[in-house]
């Protein structure tokens, strides 16, 4: 007996239509974008709170700078990563596919690379070490991750594999078979559990880079676990018959995260 998908309208409210220069526009506020907005505001509040308690190491102005470039990194990196990692064939056939953002498609691993690029720039601009910036940012990242997974669930996308567990759901775009609600698993692990883990760990270590390492380790492990029940991307399938692209991209995160946590104290 499968649970019914709640079928929440992905659009909260529509505006218009508006006719501009002969073109009709009907902008809309969607739950997917709204969840990210809520996540961004919550992350901003927490970062400002951390800055206020940093004994002058961070100012709110510096946090605003970090958020601005971090946001750009997430959007640009997430889109580029999605196209290169998951739809490279589309890009080769039509490079303009990269700019078709309205069709959806973001990659966490691409967004991570974008954020890393932004943090390198902020570290240079504010004359800090890279990990001084990364350790500041890492504890709030799960907020955005969790918000995004709720958006995925409302959209009825990125569902799991066919299953007979009691909480399985039939998704409108997933066929008649009941499936794992893998978006909710990711919300619970990558959002809630990872946030609590990083909050706890950040209070118990002063080692430079360790909090960043715990984020990489925790996210990588959680992603590898959930990918075992998440439906593989249709255009990619499984590599070597058992690994998804998400798992392949997460394994280096686990290894580098372990290195950052276990490396000798003081080594940069």
Swiss-Prot record:
GO cellular component, one term: plasma membrane
Residue sites binding a 1,2-diacyl-sn-glycero-3-phospho-(1'-sn-glycerol) per the record: 149
Magnesium is among the record's keywords: no
Function: Catalyzes the transfer of the diacylglyceryl group from phosphatidylglycerol to the sulfhydryl group of the N-terminal cysteine of a prolipoprotein, the first step in the formation of mature lipoproteins.
Keyword check for Nucleotide-binding: no
Keywords on record: Cell inner membrane, Cell membrane, Membrane, Transferase, Transmembrane, Transmembrane helix
A GO term, aspect molecular function: phosphatidylglycerol-prolipoprotein diacylglyceryl transferase activity
Name of the protein: Phosphatidylglycerol--prolipoprotein diacylglyceryl transferase
Membrane-topology annotation of the record: Multi-pass membrane protein
Pathway terms, separated by semicolons: Protein modification; lipoprotein biosynthesis (diacylglyceryl transfer)
Entry's Gene Ontology BP terms: lipoprotein biosynthetic process
Family, per entry: Belongs to the Lgt family.
Cellular location(s): Cell inner membrane
PANTHER family attached to this UniProt entry: PHOSPHATIDYLGLYCEROL--PROLIPOPROTEIN DIACYLGLYCERYL TRANSFERASE, PROLIPOPROTEIN DIACYLGLYCERYL TRANSFERASE
